Amino acid sequence: VRVNKWLGVTLCLVASTAVAKQDKEAYQDCILASASKAEDTSAASMMTNACHRLYIDNFLLSQKDQDYFQCLLDYLPDVKKRSVAVQVQQTCDQKHRSFFN
């Protein structure tokens, strides 16, 4: 019985490590696909955070939050000015996180 218990724990650890690796790979792909194109440092920071929240720190991330972070990744890569990055962030927030949606 002890062997089966340890075998189960080991299998769970191996499975969780594989999932974490997939998330890390998706995070890296996200950074390469979006943040690496940024010309504005604040937009790059917002996109890096969005990638992190979607693929690394996504425990209990709501669908509204997922949609918000994806909105940032969809619209921030071409931003060249901080003021526009802030406008995109506010618009994504209003569209996806508003209490009225």
Protein language model regions, located:
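Mitochondrial intermembrane space
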Residues: 12-101
